[in-house]
Amino acid sequence: MQTEHVILLNAQGVPTGTLEKYAAHTADTLLHLAFSSWLFNAKGQLLVTRRALSKKAWPGVWTNSVCGHPQMGESNEDAVIRRCRFELGVEITAPEPVYPDFRYRATDPNGIVENEVCPVFAARTTSALQINDDEVMDYQWCDLADVLRGIDATPWAFSPWMVMQAANSEARKLLSAFAQHN
């Protein structure tokens, strides 16, 4: 895969340029565009993944299915599809927005900052997983209700963006409806 970049944004969310992805994530990360996705199988189970230990930010942490950064000229939906193929080797249905205006800033224990405008999508897998070990070290298919209870009881066990997304009542409602629509 070619070197990825992030699309830098001003405070109003307007693109101002690009920066190489690895260089972008530091203790002083600039605001940039990202996406987050929650993938469900035909049984309505959520794919929860554990980030590879080689990841720069939040290595080894459990999180929602796939996250990433759209490239210049690429739609968020196309970026979700691209990263699902790269990280999980999986095909998905068209991603549907569940929390389009999600924005967050969080600092991991090593001081790496995420500072993102990060629309959240849900999609259904349509093929078997073929995990990329450089991205994902473990995964589990879970009932969404169990995952949400786990997040509520032990938020420290999950990525901060997953916890913040799950805390939004409208996103939670849309994810629950998505999981129930088999």
Curated annotation (Swiss-Prot):
Pathway: Isoprenoid biosynthesis; dimethylallyl diphosphate biosynthesis; dimethylallyl diphosphate from isopentenyl diphosphate: step 1/1
Organism, as annotated: Escherichia coli O17:K52:H18 (strain UMN026 / ExPEC)
Binding site for Mg(2+): E87
Domain of life, per lineage: Bacteria
Enzyme class: isomerase
Catalytic activity: isopentenyl diphosphate = dimethylallyl diphosphate
Pfam families: NUDIX
Cofactor note as given: Binds 1 Mg(2+) ion per subunit. The magnesium ion binds only when substrate is bound. Binds 1 Mn(2+) ion per subunit.
Protein name per its UniProtKB record: Isopentenyl-diphosphate Delta-isomerase
UniProt keyword annotation of Isomerase present: yes
The family this protein is said to belong to: Belongs to the IPP isomerase type 1 family.
Compartments, record wording: Cytoplasm
Active-site residue numbers: C67, E116
Chief place where the protein resides: cytoplasm
Binding site for Mn(2+): H25, H32, H69, E114, E116
Key words, A-Z: Cytoplasm, Isomerase, Isoprene biosynthesis, Magnesium, Manganese, Metal-binding
Function comment: Catalyzes the 1,3-allylic rearrangement of the homoallylic substrate isopentenyl (IPP) to its highly electrophilic allylic isomer, dimethylallyl diphosphate (DMAPP).
GO molecular function: isopentenyl-diphosphate delta-isomerase activity; metal ion binding
Cofactors, names only: Mg(2+); Mn(2+)
CDD domains attached to this UniProt entry: NUDIX_IPP_Isomerase
Record-annotated Nudix hydrolase domain positions: 30-164
